[in-house]
Amino acid sequence: MKSLVKAKKEPGIWMQDIPVPEYGVNDVLIKIKRTAICGTDIHIYSWDEWAQATIPVPMTVGHEFYGEIVEVGKEVQGLKVGQRVSGEGHITCGFCRNCRAGKRHLCRNTLGVGVNRPGCFAEYLALPATNVIALPDNITEEQAAILDPFGNAAHCALAFDVVGEDVLITGAGPIGIMAAAIVRHIGARHVVITDVNDHRLELARKMGVSRAVNVKYQKLSDVANELGMLEGFDVGLEMSGNPMALNDMMKAMNHGGHVALLGIPPQETPIDWNQVIFKGLVIKGIYGREMFETWYKMIAMLQSGLNISPVITHNFPVDEYQHAFQIMASGQSGKVILNW
C-alpha cells in the first residue's frame, strides 16, 4: 500500500509501498480517505531534536484521519464494516493507575499513532477498536479528519468555566483558533487571541473572536481597556509554547484567574511566580483529549452548530504531500488536508 514514511534519519518524508498492516482480534482495519498534517508531523519531517530522540526509523507517520472500516477483528463488538470513523491517536495500556481509574488521557505508558507505532499516512490503518470513533452522518469528511486537533482545542477550552468570562488565547495556530471558536460558541464574553502571524490572526477573525491582536504592534493592556475590561482576563488558554506569551498571559490575568497550558515550550521556561502566587492563579496542564468525554462533547458541539471548517485552508492529493508539508510549515495556512 502507499504510505508516507520517515525512512531516513535526516530531514524529509518519503512515499513508499509497504504491506497492509495486520490487525488483531480486538482491532479494526480502516481504509484511509483523508488525513491532516499536524505540527508533530512537521517536527518529524524537519528531524529536529525532539524527533531524533523520539521517532524510531522507519516509521509511517500521521495521526489525524478520516476513513471507513473494511475489516473487523473477531472479538470486536459495536463496530462493523462500512462505518465512517475517526480515532483517538493515543493508545493506552489499560492497567496503570490512571487507566484503571478511567483517566486514560493520563496513562504513563501511552503510545502515539504515527509516533511510536505505525500511523495513518497510508492507505490502511490498524487500530484498537476501543480507540475507534464511529461518526454520525452530519460530520463531514474534512471535519472528521481534524477531530484529533479539535479535541486538543476542546479539552483545553472546556478545562474551566468560560460562560460570561473574558478569555485570552495566546497562539493563533489551528488549535488556538478552534479553541477561540469553542469558547465563543459556549458563551464567553470577550475572546482575545494573540500572535505575531497576521495570516493566522485574520483566520481567527473569521472564527468570531472579539479581537485578534498582533503583539508586535499592540499591547494587551490597551486591548483590554478598549473592550472595557477593568480587572483582567478570567481564563487564559496558552497555545503557543512561547515563553514571552506565557508571561504576558500571567500579567494579563485577573486575580483568581484560571490558566490552561497546551503549548509546548522549546526549552525550560522561567515564570514570574509572583504573578501566580499573589494573584492566586490556578494553572492546569493539558495533554491530548479526555477519553472519551472530550470526543462526545466536540461531536455534540459540531452537531449544535459550531463551525470549524474555516480553519481548513488547503486540500491536496497525497501525491503532492511535499508541497502540502511546505505550506503547513510556512505558517501561511490553517489545517492542511491530504486526500487519499
UniProtKB/Swiss-Prot annotation:
Reaction equation(s) it catalyzes: L-threonine + NAD(+) = (2S)-2-amino-3-oxobutanoate + NADH + H(+)
Chief localization: cytoplasm
Residues with site note (Important for catalytic activity for the proton relay mechanism but does not participate directly in the coordination of zinc atom): 148
InterPro entries cross-referenced by the UniProt entry: ADH-like_C, ADH-like_N, ADH_Zn_CS, GroES-like_sf, L-Threonine_3-DHase, NAD(P)-bd_dom_sf, PKS_ER, Zn_alcohol_dh
Top enzyme category: oxidoreductase
Binding residues annotated for Zn(2+) 2, in chain numbering: 93, 96, 99, 107
Keywords: Cytoplasm, Metal-binding, NAD, Oxidoreductase, Zinc
Pathway involvement of the protein, from the record: Amino-acid degradation; L-threonine degradation via oxydo-reductase pathway; glycine from L-threonine: step 1/2
GO MF, any single term: L-threonine 3-dehydrogenase activity
Active site: 40, 43
Keyword Oxidoreductase: yes
Binding sites annotated in the UniProt record for NAD(+): 175, 195, 200, 262-264, 286-287
Co-factor binding details: Binds 2 Zn(2+) ions per subunit.
EC number annotated for this UniProt entry: 1.1.1.103
Binding positions for Zn(2+) 1 per the UniProt entry: 38, 63-64
GO CC annotation: cytoplasm
Cofactor: Zn(2+)
Assembly and oligomerization: Homotetramer.
Physiological role: Catalyzes the NAD(+)-dependent oxidation of L-threonine to 2-amino-3-ketobutyrate.
Name listed for the protein in its UniProt record: L-threonine 3-dehydrogenase
Organism of derivation: Legionella pneumophila (strain Lens)
Lineage: Bacteria, Pseudomonadati, Pseudomonadota, Gammaproteobacteria, Legionellales
